[in-house]
From Swiss-Prot:
PANTHER family reported in the protein's UniProt record: GLUTAMATE 5-KINASE (PTHR43654:SF3)
Pfam families the UniProt entry points to: AA_kinase, PUA
Primary gene name: proB
Family per record: Belongs to the glutamate 5-kinase family.
The protein's annotated pathway: Amino-acid biosynthesis; L-proline biosynthesis; L-glutamate 5-semialdehyde from L-glutamate: step 1/2
Domain PUA: start-end pairs: 274-345
Record SUPFAM superfamilies: Carbamate kinase-like, PUA domain-like
Enzyme class: transferase
Positions with a binding annotation for ATP: 7, 166-167, 209-215
Entry's EC annotation: 2.7.2.11
Name of the protein this chain belongs to: Glutamate 5-kinase
Biological process, per Gene Ontology: L-proline biosynthetic process
Residue numbers binding substrate: 47, 134, 146
Amino acid sequence: MSLWVVKVGTSLLRGNEKQSTAEVIESYSACLSASLKRGDHVVLVTSGAVGLGCNRLGLSQRPVDVVALQGTAAIGQGQLMALYEAAMSRRGHTVAQVLLTRSDLGSRQRYRNASSTLKQLLDWGVLPVVNENDALSPEELRYGDNDTLSALVATAVEADQLIMLTDVDRLYSSDPRINASAEPISDVYHPHELTALEVAAGEGGAWGTGGMTTKLAAARIATASGITVLLADGRDPQVLDGLLQGRRSGTVFHPHPQPLGNRKSWLAHALKPLGTLQLDEGACDALQHRGASLLLVGVKEVEGNFEANQPVRLINPEGNELARGLCSLSSKELREAIETQMSTNRSPVVVHRDVLVLRNA
């Protein structure tokens, strides 16, 4: 028995001249049903609410205004669930709607509640259908077409594998739709490879278009938690059917050999940093090579405004992110402490190692 998280993006659910959105969902549902009947557990993370809402209102263009986007999402979400409910119930399955926001997963208690609820639904043999709560999300629908959400959900339920379906057949060194010499990438083994790909994406190279950058970020989150990530072609439902039966397709992102525990993964990925601490070389070395806590003496600059025990980024002198953690002092207290530390021998702990996660840990 395997525990799968399957993510279906907006581009695949728009429909085309060959298939309507309802027919696309019907095809995916047949694959998911077969997996459930084999005894697997499956969580579906799906986009598509805004598009269906636009269709219902007769809008030819996706709204730009945030309130209009939230309104179309509210209209479309009911239609989206109705399509999945109809397709799965015809095959004898029950579905459950789970709507999440970044603030839900950023609260440790609500994260644990979401995890427990999803696991209970899976124990009952139910198919949880997860989407961002676009109608209420204060982050202006910026989760990244649910890529990041799917990785956080996979971590929360401790999935074996995350399947991200997209409109290309695998990862390439550059966009194959505009570069005929783009090279296919079948395997990504190490966080350093992910880092190189993310840099290339930022420069318009690998995954620089079509929302691929967010898929790289999602792969980093999931693989750091010990989850295998499969990026594959979602235009052909038979690809999904094969993946759910263990056949290989697309690009495989292999899990980190020393995965983060659930709490550390939450610290590293579910929280949105509210500030940044720039460290000196000595502090960077202590964190990276000695497993130390961050002491006040190692903090050179403080950016942003935050309260005590809120998340911050830790960067090296070159400005590269080294780690994330919960700062024991508020930004105001920390700035004052930095100014006065020359007159005292005390160097209190700013981020304890128990609530600190290295970027490539």
